[in-house]
């Protein structure tokens, strides 16, 4: 009997102290939000292949131009005060050196482009979004090594 009690107690303590248990506030979704309720088991899922908002600089199209068709575009949201972003920036430089002109890397400073970050629902930094043909292919809301990014981009080239 003592063995069963010990096992149950050990399992209970192990669950709360070994596994990362987080609490999140339930948020209602809107049509612009990429997170939508899926079913009663999965609270949210990322709706992939979502059309992206129009990006412009000084009145000219950056992404929606004809020359960007079938080009993989990497949006990298960062901030100068973010320590993980400084590590991610070196990985993004490696990515740019590896692919050269085969991809289009667009670095977006969060402090200067808050409205754009809201359009893409950026909640954490660094955030990396892969786009192709005005469609979101993948999204990473954390640090990602250059090797993982290279493998992810190879799938879509």
Swiss-Prot record:
It is found in: Parasitophorous vacuole membrane. GO terms for molecular function: protein-disulfide reductase activity. Residues 46-157 form the Thioredoxin domain. GO terms for cellular component: cytoplasm; membrane; mitochondrion; PTEX complex; symbiont-containing vacuole; symbiont-containing vacuole membrane. The keyword Transport applies. The disulfide bond between Cys-82 and Cys-85 acts as a redox-active center and is reduced by thioredoxin reductase TRXR. SUPFAM superfamilies: Thioredoxin-like (SSF52833). Residues 1-23 form the signal peptide. Keywords: Disulfide bond, Electron transport, Membrane, Redox-active center, Signal, Transport. Disulfide bonds join 82-85. It is a peripheral membrane protein. InterPro entries: Thioredoxin-like_sf (IPR036249), Thioredoxin_domain (IPR013766). Participates in various redox reactions through the reversible oxidation of its active center dithiol to a disulfide and catalyzes dithiol-disulfide exchange reactions. As part of the translocon PTEX complex, plays a role in the export of parasite proteins into the host erythrocyte. The translocon PTEX complex is a multi-protein machinery resident in the parasite parasitophorous vacuolar membrane, responsible for protein secretion into host cells. Belongs to the thioredoxin family. This is Thioredoxin 2. The lineage of its organism: Eukaryota, Sar, Alveolata, Apicomplexa, Aconoidasida.
